[in-house]
């Protein structure tokens, strides 16, 4: 009888302990359009995986084939004529997946989900992307299954401003639509932007016309992560180093390299569709992040 009681107590304590551990380990899904967009959250993701020991997965909607125009410097590296459109579109999807996974290894990404939708060309027109270019039912069905199975607490997307790539807008819109249609517990979905401490203008975003799920009433981000926080020996290290490492892995995308040392803050915006109940969870997560430093 005594052994049975002890076993029961031990079992209950194990359940409690696991619950406490899981409560402190955030589960995050990133949903982006291209195999380099994750750089917009690089410092935040690194802190979640390395300092809070959380899990971050990544879903990428397109195959990245349209990046051939920026691949000149990568041609001798890969020994492929990547700036030739036909050649670039043939080889870049595989190359960019490998680059992304190398970058993700730095950030601590756990699982990758590639949707392989066409990366046709740069456009601001999200309507054409959603109506013509991508297989939207397939994307939403797979996103739904990934979110349901992953039991995520948060989803990170890029803030879908008017001036951003139509593919970026599309990826965020589909994530918002998928979350809104969930019958089970919904993760909090956030839109991210970057800014510099010397910026003379600030982001103003309240939503995209014809896409009410993108509505944001707040006039400023709910929270930000400072890439310039210093740590290590004589405080000589910052999270910008991690961001630069991550960017450097995307060698086929020459224009990406120009973002090194740019962007001081990763800003996260709260979509109205989350309701107010998720705000406290967001603030708790980022309070932990802003009080944690890698050691």
Positions of the model-derived regions?
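Sec/Tat signal peptide C-region and signal peptidase I cleavage site
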Residues: 15-19
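Metal-dependent de-N-acetylase/amidase catalytic core
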Residues: 2-3, 20-31, 128-132, 136-295
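Active-site rim/loop-helix segments in enzyme catalytic domains that contact anionic ligands
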Residues: 20-150, 177
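Sec-dependent N-terminal signal peptides
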Residues: 4-14
């Amino acid at each position: 009888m005594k052994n049975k009681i002890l076993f029961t107590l031990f079992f209950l304590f194990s359940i409690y302990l696991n619950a406490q551990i899981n409560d402190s380990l955030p589960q995050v899904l990133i949903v982006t359009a291209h195999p380099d967009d994750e750089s917009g959250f690089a410092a935040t993701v690194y802190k979640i995986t390395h300092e809070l020991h959380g899990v971050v997965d990544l879903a990428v909607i397109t195959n990245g084939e349209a990046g051939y125009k920026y691949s000149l410097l990568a041609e001798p590296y890969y020994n492929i004529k990547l700036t030739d459109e036909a050649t670039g579109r043939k080889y870049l999807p595989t190359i960019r997946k490998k680059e992304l996974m190398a970058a993700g290894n730095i950030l601590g990404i756990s699982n990758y989900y590639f949707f392989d939708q066409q990366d046709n060309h740069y456009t601001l027109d999200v309507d054409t992307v959603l109506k013509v270019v991508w297989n939207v039912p397939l994307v939403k069905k797979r996103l739904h299954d990934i979110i349901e199975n992953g039991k995520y607490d948060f989803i990170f997307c890029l803030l879908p401003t008017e001036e951003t790539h139509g593919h970026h807008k599309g990826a965020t819109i589909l994530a918002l639509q998928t979350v809104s249609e969930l019958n089970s517990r919904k993760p909090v979905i956030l839109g991210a932007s970057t800014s510099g401490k010397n910026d003379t203008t600030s982001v103003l975003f309240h939503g995209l016309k014809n896409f009410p799920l993108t509505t944001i009433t707040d006039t400023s981000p709910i929270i930000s992560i400072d890439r310039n926080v210093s740590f290590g020996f004589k405080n000589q290290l910052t999270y910008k180093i991690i961001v630069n490492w991550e960017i450097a892995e995307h060698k086929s995308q020459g224009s990406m390299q120009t973002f090194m040392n740019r962007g001081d803050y990763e800003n996260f915006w709260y979509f109205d569709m989350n309701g107010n109940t998720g705000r406290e969870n967001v603030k708790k997560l980022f309070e932990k992040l802003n009080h944690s430093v890698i050691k």
